[in-house]
């Protein structure tokens, strides 16, 4: 099978559907996708369980690696920054302002890696009421 995105590294901090769906499409095309999740809770879709596991989580996060990092902690933010320095793409689908509070806003990440493609997916834009 052709893997046109082989060699592309993606950091995926998306939750539920829009962020993870973007990441899984890139993974299916050969990109190395690293899912970054909060320690202890992870992606909220993990809690949408069937019998033994969450089929929703499995569907949208196949072919990905996973790491737990709390970017509010200095040591975890430093580890995240190392990943950013080697990444080609960053995906998030937070509400407006959340990425900045977590230390993963576009200005900061592009300062670490100017060639980074920053994908901020919103349901209502950065200026919408939600």
Where are these regions (language model features)?
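N-terminal helix-loop segment corresponding to the beta1-alpha1 unit
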Residues: 1-130
């Amino acid at each position: 099978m052709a893997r046109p995105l082989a060699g592309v590294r993606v950091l995926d901090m998306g939750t539920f559907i829009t962020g993870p769906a973007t990441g899984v499409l890139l993974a299916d095309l050969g990109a190395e996708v690293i899912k970054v999740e909060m320690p202890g809770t992870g992606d909220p879709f993990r809690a949408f369980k069937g019998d033994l596991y969450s089929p929703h989580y499995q569907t949208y996060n196949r072919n990905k690696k996973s790491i737990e990092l709390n970017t509010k902690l200095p040591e975890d933010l430093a580890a995240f920054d190392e990943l950013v320095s080697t990444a080609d793409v960053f995906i998030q689908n937070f509400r407006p302002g959340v990425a900045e509070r977590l230390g993963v806003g576009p200005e900061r990440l592009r300062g670490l890696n100017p060639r980074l493609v920053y994908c901020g997916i919103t349901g209502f834009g950065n200026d919408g009421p939600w």
